C-alpha cells in the first residue's frame, strides 16, 4: 500500500552473488520478522533492453511483475516456478497424456506471447513452469524469467521458443 510502517519488521537474511546468466545478479532474501515469510529480489545493472522487456511483460502478459529502476540499478522480484530444463527432464516424463496436452497448449500461448513481445532466447533455462493445483488436476503455466533479449534479431525464429532444440519435448 506504499506505507513505510512494515519496514522495521523486514530483515535482509542473506545476499548471494549469482554466477548464472549475463547479468550476474545479487540475490537478496528479505524476511518479515512478524510471520517469517520471505521473498527474493535480484539486484542487477539496468540496461534499456531489460527494462523494455520487463515493461512489455508487465503490460502484455497475464502475469504482473514487480520491479524497480533507480539510475542504473534494477531490482526484480523473483519469479517462482520449476526451471524449464528441470521440468522437461524430471517432471514432463511423469505427466499424464491430458497434462501433456494442457502443457502443449500453454506452450503455444507462451510461444505467441514471446513473438508479440519480441522476447528472444527463450531456451528451457530462461522460463519456469508454474504448477497450479486445482480440485482434480494440475494446470501448468509457463512464465519467462529472462527479459533482456528484446528486438535484436531480424530472424523471427529467435522469438519463437518452439524452434530451440531444448524445447522440442514441450512442443
Question: Which positions does each model-derived feature cover?
Answer:
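Conserved kinase catalytic-core segment
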Residues: 93-159
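Conserved ATP-binding subdomain of kinase catalytic cores across diverse folds
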Residues: 1-86
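General N-terminal targeting signals
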Residues: 59-60, 91, 159-161
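AlphaC helix of the protein kinase catalytic domain
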Residues: 85-94
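Charged, amphipathic alpha-helical linkers/stalks
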Residues: 159-171
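Active-site catalytic-loop/activation-segment of kinase and kinase-like phosphoryl-transfer enzymes
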Residues: 83-86, 152-156, 164
Amino acid at each position: 500500500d506504499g506505507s513505510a510502517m512494515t519496514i522495521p519488521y523486514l530483515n535482509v537474511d542473506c545476499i548471494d552473488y549469482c554466477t548464472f546468466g549475463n547479468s550476474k545478479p545479487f540475490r537478496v532474501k528479505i524476511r518479515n520478522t512478524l510471520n517469517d515469510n520471505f521473498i527474493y529480489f535480484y539486484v542487477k545493472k539496468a540496461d534499456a533492453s531489460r527494462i523494455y522487456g520487463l515493461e512489455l511483460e508487465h503490460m502484455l502478459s497475464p502475469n504482473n511483475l514487480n520491479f524497480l529502476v533507480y539510475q542504473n540499478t534494477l531490482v526484480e522480484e523473483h519469479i517462482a516456478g520449476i526451471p524449464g530444463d528441470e521440468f522437461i527432464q524430471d517432471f514432463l516424463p511423469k505427466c499424464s497424456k491430458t497434462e501433456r496436452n494442457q502443457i502443449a497448449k500453454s506452450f503455444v500461448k507462451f510461444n505467441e506471447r514471446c513473438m508479440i513481445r519480441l522476447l528472444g532466447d527463450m531456451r528451457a533455462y530462461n522460463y519456469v513452469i508454474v504448477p497450479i493445483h486445482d480440485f482434480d488436476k494440475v494446470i501448468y503455466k509457463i512464465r519467462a524469467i529472462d527479459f533482456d533479449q528484446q528486438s535484436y534479431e531480424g530472424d523471427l525464429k529467435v522469438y519463437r521458443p518452439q524452434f530451440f532444440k531444448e524445447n522440442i519435448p514441450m512442443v
